[in-house]
Amino acid sequence: MEAGHGSMLLVYAVIAIALLILLITRYKVYPFLVLIIVSLLLGLVSGMPMATIVKSFETGNGNTLGHIAIVVGLGTMLGKMMAESGGAERIATTLIDKFGEKNIHWAMMVVAIIVGLPVFFEVGFVLLIPIAFNVARRTNKSLLLVGLPMVAGLSVVHGLIPPHPAAMLAVQQYHADIGKTIAYGLIVGIPTAIVAGPLFALMISRAIKLPKENALASQFLGAAGGEGKDGANPSAAKRELPSFGITLFTVLLPVILMLVGSWADLVFAPKTLPNDLLRFFGNSDVALLTAVLVSFWTFGARRGFTRDQIQKFCGECLAPIAGITLIVGAGGGFGRVLMDSGISKEIVNAATSVHMSPLLFGWLVAALIRLATGSATVAMTTACGIVAPIAAAGAVQVRPELLVLATGSGSLIFSHVNDGGFWLIKEYFGMTVGQTFKTWSLLETIISLMGLGLTFALAAVV
């Protein structure tokens, strides 16, 4: 449906994005509310019938949450079980022993990439930051040297590597092959994480000195005695940490199932029972559900947790993700209004007329929305709806898997004050706003630009 005409629709889109930035950054209005308000206003000024504006927004919101809410919920449960059982600590300590103290920043990057696969950035950060505090104290290293590689690994996984929920959303929107996307994501993501993580951390930790006293760190470092959650004794829990092998298997089980599912047609004839079974268990929802159920045994029952404790863990972990889930859904609603108002079509026409590469366009749109909303996931959600028609209609055809990477790279650019992650890192690291810009914001921009560059390089050879 087109409700407006001509180039004025492009002007409305620019004004809408500017209004998003103004309301979120200057007037501190919550992004969920801003996305709804701006979506409705955009529908009105673009000429959409009033009766269809709300329906359009609800359709986009529902289509987005219909998939992402399940992935987010299951991924968060898996991360919670791993944290409560000590699985994350097991992964960290094992890799630290293998890498050694001199290479601790490399170990933290690897830990973050592994742990971050099934969970959102904020969840992975909260799970791993206690480990970073303890590692920094034990090795007498700067928290920046230990922590920045960790957040770089989490960020790269967030935007570039399925089965992370944000990347999975882009895979779905572009109809990309998940197996190829994972492979390409690793090719682009690992070098990017190395540069933005350990190498950048080595440089910036020499230039920026954090205060010696950190109240949040003291809380985690001072929890050696007493009882843990649900009356569990910390020392007893530590003696019963899951093995490295079983922890790694449980965390990577969704990836394994999705990869095997993508090979179904190569192994079995289509529409046969074995083929259908592989595809069924390779579905992201089913793969994550399977991993969560397995974690109830590997991270739960085998660690001595009761059924009531496991159920409590699952309930506790869902409350913190409610806000980001609503924002993601609203981003999908905003993207649908852009489409139904005819703005997406005008953007397609404009981009086609200037012969912009679909990869560059996907990166640019996601980057603009990221700067406006502060959410990498919202940026990917909205940008995919805009860019997908260009990929289909443009003269230059590119692999949909590369579009996922380009859009994901754009969604990670320059985190600033409208991003919850910005404040999360500022407070936990004990930094000033200026220091957070020089570290976290710059790190995110390095990931974004290098991710785009490597995606273009990969496009030249695949």
Task: State each model region's role.
Residues 46, 83-88, 98-102, 135-146, ...:
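Juxtamembrane helix-boundary/capping and inter-helix hinge elements in multi-pass membrane proteins
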Residues 99-102, 189, 358-462:
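C-terminal transmembrane helix pair
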Residues 7-11, 50, 62-68, 95-110, ...:
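Membrane-interfacial loop-to-helix junctions in multi-pass transporters
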Residues 2-77, 90-94, 98, 257-330, ...:
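Hydrophobic transmembrane alpha-helices of multi-pass solute/ion transporters
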Residues 96-184, 372-409:
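Hydrophobic transmembrane alpha-helices that form the pore/transport pathway of multi-pass ion
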Residues 27-31, 65-68, 79-89, 115-130, ...:
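Short helix-coil transition sites and intra-membrane helix breaks within transmembrane domains
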